[in-house]
A protein has these predicted regions:
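Short acidic-glycine-tyrosine-enriched beta hairpin
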Residues: 67-83
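Ligand-binding loop in jelly-roll beta-barrel domains
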Residues: 83-110
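Short, conserved beta-strand element in jelly-roll/cupin
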Residues: 38-39, 47-64, 100
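Intrinsically disordered, low-complexity, positively charged segments
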Residues: 31-33, 40-43
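Short acidic/polar mixed-charge low-complexity motifs
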Residues: 32-33, 61, 69, 85
Length: 110
């Protein structure tokens, strides 16, 4: 992503997503990146070496966490998955999420 002096439209960026679990980078701030993605269906189980923050933009989805109760998020709610925790987002209907994480965080984890 390049430096810009214009506002970033989250709805316009969402409209460019080609399908479930595809991501677009929205911004970088300090040592973090903000990405947007669509969730629909179940993503594979994975973990990261960094914390990962999920902020539900619209719809409803759940974060399934290994050996823990799932966390359901609706628009405006957020949850941080601690580093090392195996997890997967799951949505029965399309939902959109903002991800705030380190730039080196890979989608499919470690």
């Amino acid at each position: 992503m390049t430096e810009t002096t214009t506002a970033v439209s989250i709805p316009a960026t969402i409209a460019t997503l080609p399908g479930p679990f595809q991501q677009r980078e929205l911004a970088r701030v300090n040592d973090s990146v903000v990405r947007v993605a669509q969730i629909h269906g179940a993503f594979p189980w994975h973990h990261h070496d960094e914390d990962e923050l999920f902020l539900c933009w619209d719809g409803t989805f759940r974060l399934e966490l290994e050996d823990q109760l799932p966390v359901t998020l609706t628009a405006g709610e957020l949850f941080t998955v601690p580093k090392g925790v195996r997890h997967r987002p799951v949505a029965d209907h399309p939902a959109h999420v903002l991800l705030i994480e380190r730039p080196e965080t890979t989608q499919y984890g470690n």
